[in-house]
């Protein structure tokens, strides 16, 4: 009886949907159905279904244009297109993050770090914006050699290194619309032995650091990070650290 029921269901499906009518899901709300490319339930007029492909988050290209969230990106015509990584792409010697052009990016040294960060010989980028626009916010000494530490991207907190330094980088909201990256060199740390413990604590082979500053009172051998993110050693727990317990070299 069960087999007969399944056969009836299958026949009903085939009767209502031809084999050639099954929609092809591209991803991120893009699909192809009956020779048309769709974003959600809207037909994207003029998109070539034979060359349409997803190249990043909600980014679609065919042989002529690039689309973001179903809208054609203005002033972009496919010429010498190259996908650089998830969300980053190059066209006509210009580099883009999603639908935004990265102004003044150095094409020869540009390298994607992950889906939201990239670098060239001059800057590190978050999306299409540099993270170090002003020396007042801190600078990465050698962006071309910059890389994130393992487990070094934790929400708005970043840990990275170049050939000179280890960096603690914090993205801080200044108001409802603006945020800035504050970049701090972690002074005195052994950059070949550094380990990220969580967004607040890192360590090397000798010391524990809190938000990029050495934690003088911590007992290195017994220090551990608790499940709630706080620190603890044999002497005390570290739920809140006043400024006088930090030390800059």
Predicted features along the sequence, with ranges:
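Classical Sec-dependent N-terminal signal peptides that target proteins to the secretory pathway
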Residues: 1-21
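Non-catalytic tandem-repeat scaffold regions and their flanking low-complexity/translocation tails
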Residues: 19-249
